[in-house]
Structure formats: C-alpha cells, structure tokens
Amino acid sequence: MRVSVSGPAAAAVPTAGREPSTSGGGAVAASGAAVPGSVQLALSVLHALLYAALFAFAYLQLWRLLLYRERRLSYQSLCLFLCLAWAALRTTLFSAAFSLSGSLPLLRPPSRLHFFPHWLLYCFPSCLQFSTLCLLNLYLAEVICKVRCATELDKHKILLHLGFILASLLFLAVNLTCAMLVHGDVPENQLKWTVFIRALINDSLFILCAISLVSYICKITKMSSANVYLESKGMSLCQTVIVGSVVILLYSSRACYNLVVITISQDTLESPFNYGWDNLSDKAQGEDGNGGDYIVFGMVLFLWEHVPAWSVVLFFRAQRLNQNLAPAGMISSHSYSSRAFFFDNPRRYDSDDDLPRLGNSREGSLSNSQTLGWYGTMTGCGGGTYTVTPPLNGPVTDTAPLLFTCSNLDIRNHHSLYVTPQN
C-alpha cells in the first residue's frame, strides 16, 4: 500500500511516555480519541477477512483452470497467481496485526523488524500490483494482435514484452534499493530524498502503464470483431472496458496523489494516514495513530487496494467456455451438423492432423448406414417414400450435396444421383 495524505504531521522520535503526535490540531485528536480500540480491531478483522476471501477466490480459480484443462502458463493464470500472492501477504499482515490482544503493532512497521520481512510485508505487495497492471496491458495487446492478425504486430510483441518486463524489474529494483537504504543508518535529509526519488519513479511507472492501458482500450473499442474474440474467451467488451477503467482510475489517482503530496510536504517523513507504508521509515515508529486516522486509512485501503484487486480477479476468473459460437458469429471448426453443406462446409480448412480423428469418428456411422460417400440409386416406392440401394462393390468417393428434394422427383421415375451423408 502506497498512500500519502498531506498534513503537518511531524516525524516523532520514539520516547518513553511521549504522547502520540497527530496532524490537524486538537479537532483531529479529539475525533481520534473518540474512536475506541474495539472499532480499530473490528476494522482490522474486516480487512483481514476481505483479503482472505480474495485469497480463497483466486486459489479456487486456479484450481478451476486445472479442472477445465486450460493453459497452465497464460495471462489469466499469471494474473490470478499474482493476486493470490498479494492477498496472502496482506492477509498475513492484518492477521498478525489483530492477533496480539487487540493491538495494532504491525500496521506500523516496528523498528526491530528485520529487513526482509519488513520489505516483504510492506513493500513487495506494491510490486505485485504493478506487475498485475503490466500483465493486463500485455493481455489487451495480445487481443489486438489476435483480432487484427497482422504480422507487423507480432514483430512488435517481443519488444512489448521486453518493455513491460524491464519496467517491472525497474520498479522492483527501485523499491528494494530504497528499502535497503531506509533500513540502514541513513541521515534524515538523505532519507527524505530517497523517499522522494522512490515515489517519483514508481508512481511515474504506474501513470505510464495506465496511459498505455487507456490506448489499448480505445483501440479495442474501435474493433468490431474484438467482442467476438473476447466472448470466445468467456469475456465481453463491456467487461473489459469497465475493469480497465476502474483499474486506470484508481491506480493513476493514487499515483498522482502520492506525487503531489510528497512534493508539497518534503519537510515531513510521515503522514498519519499511511502508517509508514509509503515512506518505509522506521525512525518514527514510536507513535501510534489515533482511531480517526485509522478509519480513514481503512477507507483509502478499501478503495485503492480491494476494488482494483477484486476487479482483476473477477475479470480473469476461470469459466467453462461455450464451444457453440454460432450466436456470437463464429462456427467452431470441429462442430458436427447433420445437414449437408455446399459452400459453407465448416471442415474445409481442417488440417491433415484432423483427418485420422474424423475418419475414426465416422466408422460408426458407416456401419449403420452404407450410403456414406457411395454412388447409389433412389427408386420410388408406394406411399411417397424412397429407398436407396447402394452398389455392393462400388467405389468409395467423396460426399456430394443433394441438389434436389423429394418434391422434385417423380415417384414413377428411377434416378441415379449422389446421396448425402446422414449422421
């Protein structure tokens, strides 16, 4: 979570018996004192349950992907796995926060916490969020390439993948380097510039990825066949636009807000609303935020973390795809139909690998009806019925459509024509 809120909150040095400093004067302090600790504990339990529910839902979707025999390595599975790891870290943080007699020691990083668990619980989830945003960009770019079927787009796909991979690695490197500097013995003036550079680079990357996501969504909305492709994947154009808009709005607004706040308040290290999650400072962790600050922190946490994460998981949820794409304007190349096709045979583009499978599937019908692919004669019988008698030793040929219906035949005549297969 990377949230900053402006205010004259000063960085306090841990001192025994010192009252916690708050921002906004006595009004905020009075509102914070009016909130009992049970309310803070209830909010912590609520957030922990929401994160645990997201973890369970993402875990279920990954199992459903295996059950439906989908590709194990895809944009869908990677996004679900990243959301699963992010929810697991957040659930661990909040579970430890309300487990110690109702106190909230881990929502504000303790000064004695080792570097790696400190970075893993408070810093690494933002890296997972950025990687999820990059994967969403790559997925929409893949949709555009599939719909346009352009070879020049396939050439740029490698560069696009490399670009987003390098952006994710840069985000991770900056986050990790700044966390190491802050965790060490760094002077306070250098600490401020370290936090500022980290926020400038990371939030700028968030904004750039949001802009690229906007461009991809605009291109997809202009393609008439994009909805058909998305429906074949169990999605729709409307869902794509809604989820993309929510992610763009929330992530870009958070990044812009962090940049503005950290620019106008460089003289302070900590805001009462971020609980040390933004600046990674362990030099001012002796104070405890008041109840009012924690309530606002919980509201911001729900808006900027829960909503985009749930949107992405619901968008990439596992679905049993409908193989009948005729209502969407597509016909599966492996669909079977009993009627004869003259110009629109759906199997006319089948590859050679499909021929043995198709031949095996038709052996049963050949045993029941010997008229498949044979020249035969149709003779009139009484009652307006016809009997087809194939030659016993006739050659097997390709099937041909029946060009005439029974209404065009005279019952007294004897015709020799092709017979269509009847499955």
Curated annotation (Swiss-Prot):
Q: Which UniProt keywords apply?
A: Lysosome, Membrane, Transmembrane, Transmembrane helix
Q: Does the UniProt entry include the keyword Protein transport?
A: no
Residue spans, topological domain Cytoplasmic:
64-77, 136-161, 215-241, 316-423
The listed locations are: Lysosome membrane
Disordered: region residues:
1-24
Write down the superkingdom of origin. Eukaryota
GO cellular component, as recorded: lysosomal membrane
According to its UniProt entry, this protein's organism is: Mus musculus (Mouse)
Provide the topology term for how it sits in the membrane.
Multi-pass membrane protein
Would the keyword Transmembrane be found if you checked this record's keyword annotation? yes
Q: Which residues cross the membrane?
A: 43-63, 78-98, 115-135, 162-182, 194-214, 242-262, 295-315
Q: Which InterPro entries match?
A: GPR137
Q: What role is this protein assigned?
A: Lysosomal integral membrane protein that may regulate MTORC1 complex translocation to lysosomes.
- Membrane topology, Lumenal segments: 1-42, 99-114, 183-193, 263-294
Q: What is this protein called?
A: G protein-coupled receptor 137C
User: Residue ranges under compositional bias (Low complexity)?
Assistant: 1-17
